[in-house]
Every structure is written in C-alpha cells, then in structure tokens.
Amino acid sequence: MTPTRCDRTPAWGALQAAYQTQGRAFDLRRAFALDAGRFEAFSQGAPHVFADLSKNLIDAGTEQQLLELARQTGLEQHRDAMFAGEKINTTEQRAVMHWLLRTPPADPAMPAQSVHRHMAETLHEVHTTLEAMLAFAEAVRADETITDIVNIGIGGSDLGPQMAVLALDAFVLPGKRFHFVSNVDGHELAAVLRRLKPQSTLFLIASKTFTTIETMTNARSAKAWFEAQGGTDIARHFAALTTNVAAANNFGISTTFGFWDWVGGRYSVWSAIGLPLAIAIGAVGFRDFLAGAHAMDRHFATVPLAQNLPVRLGLLDVWYRNFHGFTSRSIAPYHSALKRYPAYLQQLEMESNGKRVDAHGEALPYGTAPVLWGEPGTNGQHAYFQMLHQGTDVVPVEFVAVKQAAHDLPGHHDLLLANVLAQAQALMVGQADAGGHKNFPGNRPSTFLLLDALTPASLGALIALQEHRVFVSGSVWGINSFDQWGVELGKVLAKDVAVRLSSGNVTGLDGSTAGLLARLRA
C-alpha cells in the first residue's frame, strides 16, 4: 500500500490548525509555570542518551497530533520494511541495511523477529569481514614501526571515521597518529605528507568503486610520494577499503576489505570504512561502538512511538520545518572532541533529506531538510550565539553535553557544563526587563542531549540516534533518504571543465563560467 503524502493527511490539517491557534504564540516560560511536570513529560531516556525536549515549542496535544501524522504516513511500516531488508531505496533499487553491520551474530529480538532468514547469510558475511578487519587493526596496533595512519577518502569515507577518531581521542592508542585527507586540493595532502616518513606510514584508500576522482587523485599522489621517498613495499604500507578488488590489486594493494552496495557512504562508518577507528581504539572498543549503535537500533525498532526518542526528535523536526517555518538548526556539542560532529550531521541530514521531490519523483510543495550548522561550545558562544539570542530569525539549537570528563584538570568541566546549561536557559527565559540592545526576547527553543561519558558505546548510540531521527522525518516527508543524486551533476560538469581549463575552449559555456575560466588561464 502506497503511504499517504503527509500534506494530504487529516493529521497535517489538524497540525496546521494547532499552529495557528496555539503553536505560533506558544510561550515556554508560561508552559513551565503552568505545568510542574513538564520536564518529566518531555524528557526521554534511550540507550546511552538522555534527552530533554522540554524547552521546545510543543505541548502534549501537538505531540499526539505529530504521532498521528507518523501513523497516517506509514512510518511504522516503513521502519519495519527497512529492518526486513526490503529495497526501500527505490531510486537505486537497494535495501538499506547499515543497521545489519552492528547486529550481533545471534539476536533473536531484532525487530519483528530479528534478522529475517534471508539475511542470515549476509549477516554471516558481515561478521566474517568484521573479524578480518579487526584482526588487521590489532596487527597494526601491535606493529610499533607504524606510527602514522593516513585515511584517504571523501564524503562518508572521510567524515564518519574522522569524526569518530577525534571524538574518541581519549581511547586512541598512544604512539599512533591519524591523518585524514579528503580534499582534491593538494595543499591538504602536501601538509600531511610533510610530517610523514614512508617507512612508518600506513595509507588506507577508502573508495567503494576505487574510481572516486578526489580519492584516487590523492591516492596516486601518495603512492608517488612514497616511492620517491624510497618506499618499496606498497603491499605493506597501503590497504584498500573497497569492493573493486581488481582495481586495488592493479594499484599494488593486496590487503583489501570490502562492503556491500546497501551501505550508503554516510552510513558506512560501521563497515570496513571504520578501519581507522578500529585501529585507533582497538577491536574491543570498536565492538563497543557497534554495540551502542545496536542498542539504539533495538530502541527504534521496538519501543512504542510515543516513547521512541528518534521518533520524537524526527517529528519535532517536521513540526519546526513545516509549521513554524524554521529553516535551520544549530548543533552545539559542548565537548571539544566532538568538533567534527556538526559537519558529520550536515552530511547525514542534508544529503539524506535535502530533496525537492518525493520517492516517486513528484515535486513537493513543502520544505524538507533544514540547514544544519554549528561549532563546539564554548567557542560558539563567542561567534554566532549573538544571533541565536537576539537575531531576527529563530533557530532551534541542539546541545550535546557529557556528564563525565575524560581529563583530570580541576574546574574545567564544571565550568563547561555551567555554560551549556546557562545557554539553554538564557535562550528560553531571555531578559525582558532590560531595554533596547540588552533585551533578550527568550522563548528560543532548544533540545538537550546528555551522555554520561563519551565512550565508544555512547558515541555509537548517539550516531545511530541521529540516523534514525533523519529516517523518521524523511519517511514523513515521503522522500528517499538514501540516495544522493544532487552530488552527480557537479561531478559530471567538473570533468568537462577540467578539459576546458587545459584547452581554453569556452564554446557552449555560459558567460560567467567562460569569463572565470579565461581569467584563470590568463
């Protein structure tokens, strides 16, 4: 049965009416004054993550209408279809099974009766590959002659492992340094190579097809540098994370780890693409990372919608985007190790849900993915928080805080936590008794995600939470969250422009591109 498009459901009309009568004038300060139990009602526990949703512009009635919208658009059926291995990526005719990468060999409770029988063989392949990858990771960790690991990839082959290695810095094996090269801009690779010695470096080439232009350009340059510096054993100092084993072998690489076409790039950190993380934190740590994500999978798959954290977050995103008209969300992790977390979420959400047509290719009359942006706190307070507090646009903020520090420097962590609590409070309560430039309107919404500690398990759960939250909003909007056709046109045109930069031929180009090309060649 084809789900009903969200704007054609009774729940959508009810939500429009609710926004006009209550939502647009909703006052957080008044809501707390009238309801002593608001914090408890709008707080939600989930594996490794506690969420305070109480500072959002929503009441119980509106949330019930949002839950009804989810039901009327077939969210539960769509979720179950994903976990059943159905080809819900309809434009590419692929299943969406990144969750299988973190499913234990025997888990009889994954959703409607676990891993379906037809996926048992695939799950076995997943764990065979995982064991081989972790064995390699442990060998690299034990090899004291390898001090530098360079991951060459782009998009999901870069952002995921880079974000995770940085986030789990407290767990990284001493004596190993990790570098990530993604940009085709040679300055990035050159800056890394200047710090390396070929005999102590391992290069990981991460490309599913082993044809990605940026990645292979960097890989060839890294290989040329290695050989020019006297390196001779390509097979020992290069490994490939790819499905194109033949191309890797032709490159001179004999050690390869593959994955499957149902693993999208932005969901690939759980696969062989996570090898840098496995080397950094070890096999035990990587298994904990997978286990944390799997715990969130179970939560999403089995907990009723009203107590399901990814569902509540995803529906809140729909409420803000389509009824309040908010076009962006600020991500503010109050932990310096999460410095690449906002960038990771940018790709996850904006590449997944930044679509203008539905899953059937029909143009949509309503907004989809918001713009995500942010920086770690407290740095962001001295950059863009001015606009969050006193700007003309309301931007929902999503804070992430960690209860326990991974250092023993006295006073620092308490001050950090005081700041994140104060910012969330200030956004809500404002300062009405001051005039003019010192007036803070308040009533600015925020969500607060709290981890007990930043560990492999809690990071895995946090990432999986965000994956499923994006699934929820994309499902309600009726879009395919698992393709990314929007990245293709620029790549095609870049090949043509590269030839023109060499030849100078501007025939058929628009005036602006022709003028810029001529100036670059002058």
UniProtKB/Swiss-Prot annotation:
InterPro entries, per database record: G6P_Isomerase, G6P_Isomerase_C, Phosphoglucose_isomerase_CS, SIS_dom_sf, SIS_PGI_1, SIS_PGI_2
Keyword terms, alphabetized: Cytoplasm, Gluconeogenesis, Glycolysis, Isomerase
Domain of life the protein comes from: Bacteria
GO cellular component, one term: cytosol
Main location: cytoplasm
Pathway(s) of this molecule: Carbohydrate biosynthesis; gluconeogenesis; Carbohydrate degradation; glycolysis; D-glyceraldehyde 3-phosphate and glycerone phosphate from D-glucose: step 2/4
GO molecular function, one term: monosaccharide binding
PROSITE patterns named among the record's database cross-references: P_GLUCOSE_ISOMERASE_1, P_GLUCOSE_ISOMERASE_2, P_GLUCOSE_ISOMERASE_3
Enzyme Commission code(s) on record: 5.3.1.9
Signal peptide: none
Enzyme class, UniProt record, top EC level: isomerase
Substrates-to-products reaction catalysed: alpha-D-glucose 6-phosphate = beta-D-fructose 6-phosphate
Gene Ontology BP terms: gluconeogenesis; glucose 6-phosphate metabolic process; glycolytic process
Its biological purpose: Catalyzes the reversible isomerization of glucose-6-phosphate to fructose-6-phosphate.
Homology family: Belongs to the GPI family.
The protein, known as: Glucose-6-phosphate isomerase
Gene (name only): pgi
